[in-house]
């Protein structure tokens, strides 16, 4: 019987109760929030986001398990790979980078596909490159994940928080579905915040302090046309800006 000591170092962490665990296939797609906002299967991200996806393609190596793989959504040259700040950790963990063209050959080699975030465009790309259907979520699952990512989800949290921690009571966000509703909310709550249902990196957020109606209406009109609504939040005089990533 093969013992753990007889295995290559990169595989020893994959022994659990006597079973070998196949590697996970990671995908870095930081454009996922934009793609969720678009909702379609043929979304093209802004150039700056596409560049970030390309430059940080090996970033999953920082949290991947030794022996895992990374799927490259872009054609990355050898020089780009060698200049990546994550190459060293990738080599230390013996993580393999796989181009899209090599996806079909992984049908029996990986246990899961783990993107930065699922969306309809990524699902189409993986399907077109013959990813194993058993590793892909259904279109219905993608639609469900998109709804969970909508900012209206925070309404339930705002209502629940005070029942658990009374000191955390705060004004509940309001979903606004027309320009007139947006302006009425702004007039009743000077200096309020307006937020697109789906956005990323601070984009899609407007602080209305010192802004006139002629600035607010066009912005709200565009968001409502593309995403169906705008979320309104009362300004609370913030003390600190921060964000968290859940892995």
Question: What kind of region is each of these model predictions?
Answer:
Residues 26-39, 74-75, 117-120, 197:
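Short loop/turn segments at strand-loop or loop-helix junctions that form parts
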Residues 190, 213-247:
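Phosphate-binding site of ATP-dependent enzymes
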């Amino acid at each position: 019987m093969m013992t753990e000591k007889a295995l290559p170092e990169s595989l020893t962490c994959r022994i659990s109760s006597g079973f070998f665990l196949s590697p996970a296939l990671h995908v870095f797609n930081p454009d996922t929030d934009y793609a969720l906002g678009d909702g379609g299967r043929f979304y093209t991200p802004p150039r700056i986001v596409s560049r970030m996806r390309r430059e940080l393609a090996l970033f999953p190596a920082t949290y991947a398990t030794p022996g895992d793989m990374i799927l490259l959504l872009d054609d990355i040259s050898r020089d780009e790979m060698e200049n990546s700040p994550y190459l060293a950790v990738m080599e230390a963990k013996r993580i393999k980078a796989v181009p899209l063209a090599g996806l079909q050959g992984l049908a029996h080699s990986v246990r899961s596909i783990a993107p930065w975030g699922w969306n309809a465009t990524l699902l189409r790309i993986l399907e077109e490159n013959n990813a194993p259907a058993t590793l892909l979520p259904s279109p219905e699952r993608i639609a469900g994940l998109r709804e969970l990512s909508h900012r209206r989800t925070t309404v339930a949290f705002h209502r629940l928080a005070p029942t658990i921690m009374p000191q955390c009571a705060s004004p509940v966000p309001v979903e606004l579905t027309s320009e007139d509703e947006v302006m009425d909310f702004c007039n009743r709550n000077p200096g309020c915040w307006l937020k697109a249902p789906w956005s990323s990196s601070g984009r899609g957020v407007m602080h209305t302090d010192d802004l006139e109606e002629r600035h607010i209406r066009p912005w709200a009109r565009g968001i409502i046309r593309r995403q169906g609504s705008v979320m309104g939040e009362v300004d609370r005089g913030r003390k600190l800006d921060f964000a968290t990533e859940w892995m």
